[in-house]
Amino acid sequence: MDLDIEGNVALTTASSSGLGFASAQALVREGANVVINGRDGDSLADAKADLETEAAGDARVVAVEGDITDPDDLDRLVETTLDEFGRLDHLVTSAGGPPSGAFLDTDDEDWEAAYELLVMSVVRLARKCAEPLADGDGGTIVTITSRSVKEAIDGLVLSNSVRMSVVGLEKTLSMELGPDVRANAVLPGSHETSRIRELVDQAIERGEYDSYEEGLADWVDNPLDRIGDPIELGNTVAFLSSPRAGHVNGQAIVIDGGGGSSNL
């Protein structure tokens, strides 16, 4: 399916690896120009090089190093995008997860840091990007959150609680920014990202598993009996960003292979 986004401009955060990278990958394969972001300059440069090998047509990749919890870095990220391309069509927000832990093991600083990372980064970007997105022909926002907003996950009180605000924001944006801008969220379960691979490798080194395949199998928790491929989520993000999903708005879409037990 041609998503009809060739030549569009997409800004993707936390996109030097993981699900943010997979989203940028899917977009650039469709011919969209992408601006990627990350805190580590070396990882960002590697991601840029990888994406450029997959870019369709005349699509360009621009890398902007920065911390999404720093308002000045976010301003520079958006300004660079507009300076480079003169437009913005799609915003894809992603962020690393807050630390795991039980409620009584957290303090005020943990909650404030999680809110800055997961919520305020999206708030600031959406505020900064709303006007250029509306100026185009069908702007979109896709927020990558977690299926923990549907079902609380043991030991992840910060993610379970704070990410709910992101979904509430996304729904509100879908109402307030329409009809010029659509806003949706994707709620991933486990995907075989570099972080998961790292955790499995560490478990093998501790002697918990004999092989990578054995360790990865412990992350499988769905009827499809396999962990997700990051590009499967990336393809969904690209679809939601495209006019092919032109009547999909204000939705929070779980991408977990059917692993959740929630009816809604």
Q: What residues fall within each predicted segment?
A:
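Conserved glycine-rich Rossmann-like NAD(P)H-binding loop of the short-chain dehydrogenase/reductase
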Residues: 30-47
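Catalytic loop of short-chain dehydrogenase/reductase
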Residues: 142-166, 170-179, 189-192
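Short C-terminal tail/terminal secondary-structure segment
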Residues: 151, 237-238, 249-264
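A conserved structural motif in NAD(P)-dependent oxidoreductases
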Residues: 207-212, 221-233
